[in-house]
Amino acid sequence: MLLIPAIDLKDGHCVRLKQGDMDQSTTFGEDPAAMARKWADAGARRLHLVDLNGAFAGQPKNKAAIKAILAEVGADIPVQLGGGIRDLDTIERYIDAGLRYVIIGTAAVKNPGFLKDACSAFGGHIIVGLDAKDGKVATDGWSKLTGHEVVDLARKFQDWGVESIIYTDIGRDGMLSGINIEATVKLAQALTIPVIASGGLAGIADIEKLCEVENEGVEGVICGRAIYSGDLDFAAAQHRADELSLA
């Protein structure tokens, strides 16, 4: 089970948002590269970056911070990034800079042709982030709920060659209310590609529950507010997950 620390970037700083609201942000660090190194040293085997300004602007914004993170840890562990990725040129620039995976969210739903092209051009590097509430997909930084069923869309994306799906339950994100295991497993069972859980990770109990369903196709979990608030000791949690995976 991959525990993937999230570094959310806003105006060059590491922040956490509550329920995806840019006006409800808490700053956790002024130096994103140092934060990346901290998590790598704590045993992270992948990092999850979000360009928050980029997600809302529809184009990359925190380039300097992303570059600094890749320079710091990019040679040691794979880094994945989402937020504001809307064209193939942006993907190419990021991959050339050392990014392992590019996460396409809103654009995958609104512009499926772009996702198809991205999978053709950069096979093995494309992850789709699906944000959902009650099984329906949301877009535009969660501000718009669509009529699309998560499972239907994910199956289509799988057929196009997407590497994996990050599934976020937006009713829970940033709330420390526990991962929606049931919905995550339901999605994973419907697919042959891995699913990464996200949204609401509260503590070690969630990690233990996720390890129980790892064989259903749940590959990892994004660790956000819980590792910054102190509700989850990241190094201890990854160690516990490894123990359970070996059991």
Curated annotation (Swiss-Prot):
Pfam families per the UniProt record, alphabetical: His_biosynth (PF00977)
Enzyme class of the recorded protein, top EC level: isomerase
GO MF annotations in UniProt: 1-(5-phosphoribosyl)-5-[(5-phosphoribosylamino)methylideneamino]imidazole-4-carboxamide isomerase activity
Main location: cytoplasm
GO biological process: L-histidine biosynthetic process; L-tryptophan biosynthetic process
Keyword set, alphabetical order: Amino-acid biosynthesis, Cytoplasm, Histidine biosynthesis, Isomerase
Active-site residues, as the UniProt record annotates them: D8 (proton acceptor), D131 (proton donor)
Keyword Nucleotide-binding on entry: no
Pathway: Amino-acid biosynthesis; L-histidine biosynthesis; L-histidine from 5-phospho-alpha-D-ribose 1-diphosphate: step 4/9
Signal peptide range: none
Cell compartments where the protein resides: Cytoplasm
GO CC entries: cytoplasm
EC code(s) of this entry: 5.3.1.16
Entry-linked InterPro entries: Aldolase_TIM, His_biosynth, HisA_bact_arch, Isoase_HisA-like, Isoase_HisA-like_bact, RibuloseP-bd_barrel
Catalytic activity entry: 1-(5-phospho-beta-D-ribosyl)-5-[(5-phospho-beta-D-ribosylamino)methylideneamino]imidazole-4-carboxamide = 5-[(5-phospho-1-deoxy-D-ribulos-1-ylimino)methylamino]-1-(5-phospho-beta-D-ribosyl)imidazole-4-carboxamide
Keyword hit for Secreted: no
Family of the protein in this entry: Belongs to the HisA/HisF family.
UniProt protein name: 1-(5-phosphoribosyl)-5-[(5-phosphoribosylamino)methylideneamino] imidazole-4-carboxamide isomerase
Organism for this UniProt entry: Acidovorax ebreus (strain TPSY) (Diaphorobacter sp. (strain TPSY))
